[in-house]
């Protein structure tokens, strides 16, 4: 199963990033349950190896596009997120003090701490899009109005995969004109 994990993750990330219309400089949230990928219940079989594979692929694809990654932790760290320090500072995000482990923060946050150059935890973000691998509930960190994206693959290992993009609110009613919806073109 781990043999295909990198390839499948890359296909999903490319699909979601391209269809979300996310722009350079925007934030992208990753929620990940390595336990769910391995076929267990969320939080019951955390795997640093799985976290490293997924986060490395996501970071690689986002870095190519100039998009910033925010890795969501579990409820034991109040769903805080790991970002690069320069991102936290430039976006004026509230830095909090916690170092993730397998059972508080999770494998993806541990991997982000290893793979990012100057990682910090922040309390919350308002991201433009995100990927949820294993039903980790990333919606609280995606700006309104959220648009569900059905990824090209709905499962990664044993984990259910969903994604969210966002668009500006439509205001003004029947008399108003709107820009084209670039996420849902058809």
UniProtKB/Swiss-Prot annotation:
SUPFAM superfamilies associated with the record: TTHA0583/YokD-like
Record InterPro entries: Antibiotic_NAT-like, DUF436
Database matches in HAMAP family: UPF0340
Record family assignment: Belongs to the UPF0340 family.
NCBIfam families, per the entry: TIGR01440 family protein
Protein name: UPF0340 protein SpyM50240
């Amino acid at each position: 199963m781990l043999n295909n994990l990198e390839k499948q993750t890359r296909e999903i990330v490319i699909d979601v990033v391209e269809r979300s219309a996310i722009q350079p400089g925007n934030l992208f949230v990753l929620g990940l349950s390595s336990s769910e990928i391995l076929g267990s219940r969320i939080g019951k079989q955390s795997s640093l190896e799985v976290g490293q594979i997924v986060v490395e692929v996501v970071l690689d694809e986002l870095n190519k596009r100039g998009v910033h990654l925010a890795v969501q932790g579990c409820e034991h760290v109040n769903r805080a997120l790991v970002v690069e320090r320069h991102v936290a500072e430039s976006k004026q995000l509230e830095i909090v003090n916690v170092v993730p482990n397998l059972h508080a923060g999770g494998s993806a946050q541990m991997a982000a701490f290893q793979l990012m150059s100057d990682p910090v935890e922040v309390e919350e973000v308002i991201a433009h899009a995100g990927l949820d691998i294993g039903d980790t509930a990333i919606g609280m960190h995606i700006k309104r109005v959220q648009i569900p994206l059905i990824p090209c693959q709905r499962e990664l290992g044993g984990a259910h995969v969903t994604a969210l993009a966002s668009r500006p609110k439509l205001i003004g009613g029947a008399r108003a004109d709107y820009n084209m919806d670039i996420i849902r073109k058809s």
